A protein has these predicted regions:
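H-loop/switch region of ABC-family ATPase nucleotide-binding domains
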Residues: 233-235
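Conserved ATPase "switch" residues in P-loop NTPase domains
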Residues: 222-223
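Loop/turn-to-beta-strand initiation segments
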Residues: 193-195, 226-231
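Conserved hydrophobic alpha-helix in the ABC-type ATPase nucleotide-binding domain
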Residues: 213-218
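Phosphate-coordinating catalytic segments in nucleotide- and nucleic-acid-processing enzymes
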Residues: 1-196
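Walker B catalytic acidic pair
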Residues: 200-202
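Conserved D-loop-proximal element of ABC-family nucleotide-binding domains
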Residues: 207-208
């Protein structure tokens, strides 16, 4: 995104509940912590669902492909975990369809009243909605369960957390990918208490009725916890 910035002209400000971020005209990135930021901060599980999610549905072993965008790699990792919740007939919110998962050959199939096809061979609508719905439901359920056992960080825990984040962020030996992995590993030590679901074009390849049913499902997941957030980008 930095390629869209013009040095000396572009400024970006973000004011959050716990932190403020500023990208200055001079190209500096400034992070400012609000007072007692972590004492009120619900540690979130953040998921960005890219429009390219169809790619995961149609390619064999996408995890073996090199040079995938970071956003797609992160989504793919959660998608692989989410397959574990497909047991028996896993009902989809559209077309009275369900999913079946074969762990032995890592294959998802879409089933209807009179058909059963591999996801790779299904319509583009199914190829779009299945990864989105699976990951969203999996993470929503996972975070809701973690939130039952979450607790606010003590002052010592908050201090250690901030120091470790600062160390990772400022380590110039890390690549962006390594920094992201390190931050993810750090946050995994703590129970999440919010799910921030960022969905790009949820309507992609779906008929209007299916779009509506999908949105109802995403809102249902979002409403499980007060701290959850659903953010969508759309052309509809």
């Amino acid at each position: 995104i930095s390629n869209y910035f013009k040095k000396g002209l572009t400024e970006i400000f973000y004011e959050g509940d716990s932190y403020n971020f500023t990208y200055t005209k001079e190209g500096d990135f400034i992070i400012k912590k609000n007072t007692d930021a972590l004492s009120i901060y619900p540690l979130p599980q953040i998921m960005y669902v890219p429009a390219e999610r169809n790619f995961i549905s149609i390619v064999n072993n996408p995890s073996l492909i090199k040079e995938l965008p970071d956003s797609l790699l992160t989504f793919l990792s959660e998608y692989d975990k989410a397959k574990s919740i497909i047991k028996g007939d896993f009902i989809l919110p559209i077309n009275e369809a369900s999913l079946e998962y074969s762990k032995s050959n890592d294959t998802i199939s879409v089933k209807g009243n009179d058909y059963k096809v591999k996801l790779q061979e299904a319509s583009s609508g199914f190829q779009s909605i299945v990864p989105l719905y699976l990951v969203s439901r999996y993470l929503s359920d996972s975070v809701s369960e973690q939130a039952k056992h979450s607790h606010k960080m003590s002052n010592d825990e908050a201090k250690r957390f901030e120091e470790e984040v600062s160390r990772i962020w400022s380590d110039n030996n890390f690549t962006d990918t390594q920094r992201r992995i390190a931050l993810s590993a750090l946050s995994a030590k703590f129970n999440k208490s919010a799910f921030i679901n960022i969905v790009e074009e949820p309507e992609q390849n779906l008929f209007p009725k299916s779009q509506s049913l999908l949105m109802q499902s995403l809102l249902l997941f979002n409403n499980k916890l007060d701290a959850n957030k659903l953010i969508i980008t759309t052309h509809s």
